[in-house]
């Protein structure tokens, strides 16, 4: 059952360290009916490999520059920019020359569970372990 809430993400949402960047689950499918919300922080050059998943994903850049690849297009965006990726579309991102941060919003209830499982992997886990978790949650490497 979901309920309204107010939270302080830095004190109530510990970061999950995934492939060199941190993701805080602000709102999961356990808290809301149709959306999940995340705060992601990353150092220069970090970000996921090209992938797709069945859920929509929307990013709102808070600080730093971030390069987003969607399909065959690449764009560098900064604070105040919004990027929306339709479910099923190939995409990726890389943090630019400085530490960056964005909010992301996903449809459905799958992303938070995937991030929590990825965050539980050892920091030196092989890429195949990350890939196996992602596949279990409906994400495909592309």
Residue ranges and their predicted role:
Residues 55-66, 71:
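Glycine- and acidic-residue-biased ligand/ion/polar-headgroup-sensing regions
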Residues 8-9, 60, 72-90:
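Short acidic-glycine-tyrosine-enriched beta hairpin
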Residues 1-34, 120-142:
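A short, N-terminal "cap"/entry segment at the start of jelly-roll beta-barrel domains
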Residues 31, 67, 79, 87-112:
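Ligand-binding loop in jelly-roll beta-barrel domains
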Residues 103-129:
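A hydrophobic/aromatic-rich effector-binding and dimerization subdomain
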Residues 9, 37-52:
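Conserved short histidine dyad/triad with adjacent acidic residue
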Residues 27-29, 47-53, 94-95:
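Short histidine-centered beta-strand/loop micro-motifs
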């Amino acid at each position: 059952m979901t309920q309204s809430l107010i939270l302080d993400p830095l004190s109530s949402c510990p970061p999950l360290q995934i492939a060199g960047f941190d993701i805080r689950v602000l709102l999961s499918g356990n808290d809301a009916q149709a959306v999940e919300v995340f705060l992601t922080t990353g150092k220069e050059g970090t970000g996921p490999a090209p992938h797709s998943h069945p859920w929509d994903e929307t990013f709102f850049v808070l600080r730093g520059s971030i390069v987003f690849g969607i399909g065959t297009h690449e764009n560098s965006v900064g604070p105040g920019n919004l990027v929306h990726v339709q479910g099923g579309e190939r995409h990726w991102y890389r943090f630019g020359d400085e530490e960056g941060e964005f909010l992301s919003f996903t449809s459905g209830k799958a992303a938070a569970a995937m991030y929590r499982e990825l965050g539980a992997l050892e920091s030196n886990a092989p890429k195949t372990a990350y890939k196996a978790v992602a596949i279990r949650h409906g994400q495909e490497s592309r």
